[in-house]
Amino acid sequence: YDPISGDYSIRLDANESFLELPIELLEKAQYAMADIAFNRYPDPNATELCESFGAYYGIDPALVTAGNGSDEWLFIITSSFLMRGDKILTVEPDFSMYRFYGFLAEAESVVYQKKEDLTIDVDALIAAVNESGAKVVLFSNPCNPTSLGLCREEVRKLITSVSALVVLDEAYMDFWDQSLLGEVAQYDNLIILRTCSKAFGMAAVRLGFAVANPKLTQTLRAVKSPYNVNSVSQKIGALVMNEQEVLHQALDEIILSRKALQISLKELESKYPDQLYVYDSCTNFVLVRMPRAKEVFEGLLERGIAVRFMGDTLRITAGSAEENAQLLKNLESLLSSSTNP
């Protein structure tokens, strides 16, 4: 995974929230810093933070363990539950870091290839898991980068049909309604990952959570570093998650932005049917297939707009109304220039 570097006026490449935290909330965070004993190590259990997470989602905080973004959990889980030569099954396309962490654990990679329309045949996936003898299954739902998701019933079927540990990355589930967080305690082979980087607008803070039944949670807490989440991140994360009304309003605004962006991109698809295909989305971004994806990507960069280039597709984060308008204006300019040389 190679993040885009450089100074671009419009950043629609990393699926961050386009909304900054309200100034009132930032002022509360500033005052909260006075409560931190900077000469002391942080709470090893991130108790206040996990309680705020539990209150926000309506789950038992005893099932929640905090980490430095989901990336820390991906490393911890793959290095703790896999031994050299064990098999990890991932799906393609999906978040590229999953296979990378499996590689670091010296696990054997097994790949389930999605259908041509980028959806998952859950029965075929179950067969692939069981036939391969995979010890860990790791995938995102909804999926990054496809913007598509598996419904709750299909994920349940997967979990109950395999003996492998299912690691379900729900980084984008705040934008959909098919989470299994409320059921996680029922399963002895499920770990759900959540993040503060997307819907909550706290990408800079780097907070991620692993949610699992009591036995798995005990294991996760045993293998993580004792003081892994610093006191500043704990304090800010708890403070923000306690502001449920603010977060819900922001979430509504992000979803409206994505829907508007998707509608506008679909209009461009109707106008230039040979140049782009727009996928459905249950996330905060839209995936667009384009035969000239690289050329368009570079053209947008030249105009100060960063999106994510992924082979024959572009992944476009929903931005503010102004950012979306600039993207669409420049995108149409690039599309029309090829049809009218």
Regions flagged by a language model, labelled:
Residues 46-50, 61-85, 208:
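Conserved beta-loop-alpha segment that forms the PLP phosphate-binding cup at the N-terminus of a helix
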Residues 255, 268-303, 318:
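Conserved PLP-binding catalytic core of the aspartate aminotransferase-like
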Residues 22, 189-268, 278:
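PLP-dependent aminotransferase class I/II
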Residues 153, 294, 299-308, 312-341:
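PLP-dependent enzyme catalytic core of the Aspartate aminotransferase-like
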Residues 80-139:
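PLP-dependent aminotransferase-like
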Residues 1-40, 132-133:
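N-terminal "arm"/small-domain region of PLP-dependent enzymes with the aminotransferase-like
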Residues 116-174:
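Active-site phosphate-binding strand-loop segment of PLP-dependent enzymes
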Residues 60-64, 85-87, 170, 188-189:
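Short acidic capping loops at alpha-helix termini that bridge into adjacent secondary structure
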